[in-house]
């Protein structure tokens, strides 16, 4: 297995979130490792959260498993049941179909770096705290189905 040169993979902070939901993830930088390495059966991202940044809006996936491991720094995991501090070496997992909305918030003063892996067919998902859903064709809509 060849070593992956992270510096050769573009690091971006794009988001498809409509305003104002895009503001919370402005300090999230990520590299999509799967496409750059030829992996096609699951997604893998190398993510850096700058202090104050969120990984996403609090969300869930209808048909996608998600697994995360913190490499360095720390972040607050926010879920339906409350908050849990994650530090380097900690892992978290959400099976497909779980509606336990989740995200990370970097509430510290150092970067938090993590790997997140997702597998399964994209059939959309939801957002716990805001009026937004994500569709299977990669669109953001209000919970009543009207587009942003």
Question: What is the meaning of each model-derived region?
Answer:
Residues 1-41, 125-148:
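A short, N-terminal "cap"/entry segment at the start of jelly-roll beta-barrel domains
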Residues 30-32, 45-61, 99:
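Conserved short histidine dyad/triad with adjacent acidic residue
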Residues 38, 96-123:
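Ligand-binding loop in jelly-roll beta-barrel domains
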Residues 39-44, 62-65, 70-72, 87, ...:
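Short connector loops at helix/strand junctions that flank enzyme active sites
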Residues 46-50, 61-78, 117-119:
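Short, conserved beta-strand element in jelly-roll/cupin
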Residues 50-54, 74, 83, 98-99, ...:
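Short, charged/polar surface micro-motifs in flexible loops or helix N-caps
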Residues 80-96:
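Short acidic-glycine-tyrosine-enriched beta hairpin
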């Amino acid at each position: 297995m060849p070593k992956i040169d992270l510096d050769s993979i573009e690091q971006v902070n794009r988001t498809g979130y409509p305003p104002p939901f895009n503001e919370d993830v402005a300090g999230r930088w990520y590299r999509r490792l799967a496409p750059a390495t030829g992996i096609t059966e699951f997604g893998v991202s190398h993510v850096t959260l700058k202090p104050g940044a969120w990984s996403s809006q609090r969300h869930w996936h209808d048909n996608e498993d998600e697994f995360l491991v913190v490499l360095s720094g720390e972040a607050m995991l926010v879920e339906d049941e409350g908050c849990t501090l994650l530090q380097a070496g900690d892992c978290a997992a959400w099976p497909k179909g779980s509606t336990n909305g989740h995200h990370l918030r970097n509430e510290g003063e150092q970067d938090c770096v993590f790997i997140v892996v997702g597998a399964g067919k994209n059939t959309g998902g939801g957002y716990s705290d805001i009026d937004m859903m994500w569709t299977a064709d990669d669109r953001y809509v209000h919970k009543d189905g009207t587009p942003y």
